[in-house]
Amino acid sequence: MTPQAFYQVLIEHGITLTDKQKKQFETYFRLLVEWNEKINLTAITDKEEVYLKHFYDSIAPILQGYIDNSPLSILDIGAGAGFPSIPMKILYPEIDITIIDSLNKRINFLNILANELELSGVHFFHGRAEDFGQDKVFRAKFDIVTARAVARMQVLAELTIPFLKVNGRLIALKAAAAEEELISAEKALKTLFSQVTVNKNYKLPNGDDRNITIVSKKKETPNKYPRKAGTPNKKPL
């Protein structure tokens, strides 16, 4: 997907990028490739592939109508090089973005990226989701939590649901359909007072399969969750 094809797809969805936004995506690509030589950020560095499999892929929740340009508070867990939240922030400047990542080198990259892109309303924290999920500053404070190819739902639910306000949404982006995964996650979702409201398969413009799953939080999360760092993955609910 060339940058021009990317812009055209957005126009077809009613979004016309300004010159500033186009430059932000261009700068994002350049910094991603530069920094990828120092630290491992992505296996994808070809320009057209980055625009398709990182930029376009990240904004799927916007293109499908699940996020609008309003002062939503969005937490991105395990964003790595900033996907999906930074492309969404470029598109919709009104949203407020927080990223938690376990690798400090990636946080350093994100700080430089945000500075170069002149983004405001972005906050980056180094650490584990399990630890932040028990912190009153972060717990039950977000409208939306996003996670792109982070963990299977049985584990992901415990890492993300505690951060949501009641009626907040987890938006999980994955490469393939999640039917069996959701069956395995039924107990975890029930324990965390949350339920799947959207499970939708779609395709990227090149035909690659993708899945978006949205989970809604119905009640406050029991205090014992999330458990200590590493436990959700070793002993899923």
Swiss-Prot record:
Keywords: Cytoplasm, Methyltransferase, rRNA processing, S-adenosyl-L-methionine, Transferase. One of its GO terms (molecular function) is rRNA (guanine-N7-)-methyltransferase activity. GO terms for cellular component: cytosol. It is found in: Cytoplasm. Residues 216-237 are annotated as: Disordered. The keyword Nucleotide-binding does not apply. S-adenosyl-L-methionine binds at residues 78, 83, 129-130, 148. It holds the Pfam family GidB. Its EC number is 2.1.1.-. Specifically methylates the N7 position of a guanine in 16S rRNA. Belongs to the methyltransferase superfamily. RNA methyltransferase RsmG family. NCBIfam families: rsmG_gidB. This is Ribosomal RNA small subunit methyltransferase G. The gene is rsmG.
